Regions:
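C-terminal segment of classical bacterial N-terminal signal peptides
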Residues: 13-19
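Bacterial N-terminal signal peptides that target proteins for export
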Residues: 1-5
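Bacterial N-terminal signal peptides
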Residues: 7-12
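C-terminal and inter-domain tail/linker signature
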Residues: 19-146
């Protein structure tokens, strides 16, 4: 009986691990395509209509909740001539994703290191947080930002 319980527990762990990997891989594909459309092609409208739910939760205090509010806030910055958004890495684990990038919405500024954090549900982005660190003119260490 003890062996049967142990075997069942092992099968459960293996299945659970495979499901988590499967979720991560599905979400990685979504986030990679979202990043391509949003940051590389700078097509805010298409990226958000394809991958973001209408009642999107926004934690950036400068942007209201909702997909349309995000489109309205981001589209002018992403369509500005000389704006630059260079994705450095994408990290996905289960339902969470981080896109780490260099962003410069206004070409007259030095830009910032940005970490956009997304939560996904059923293959769609449902929630967003962001962290911005302005690019310094001087650094206390020799390490680059990226």
């Amino acid at each position: 009986m003890r062996r049967l319980v142990t075997a069942a527990a092992i099968v459960g762990l293996v299945t659970s691990g495979a499901q988590a990997r499967s979720l991560t891989e599905r979400n990685r594909a979504v986030v990679q395509d979202f990043a391509r459309i949003f940051y590389a092609e700078r097509d805010v409208e298409q990226a958000f209509r394809k991958y973001v739910v209408p009642d999107y939760i926004q934690h950036n205090p400068g942007i209201a909740d909702g997909r349309q509010a995000a489109i309205d806030a981001l589209k002018p910055m992403f369509s500005r001539p000389g704006a630059q958004f260079d994705v450095k890495r994408i990290i996905v684990d289960g339902d969470l994703a981080v896109i780490h990038l260099f962003g410069r919405g206004d070409p007259s500024t030095p830009g910032a290191a940005v970490a956009d954090i997304y939560r996904l549900k059923d293959g769609k982005i449902v929630e967003h947080w962001d962290i911005l660190q302005p690019m310094p003119t001087q650094s206390a260490n020799p390490h680059p930002m990226f």
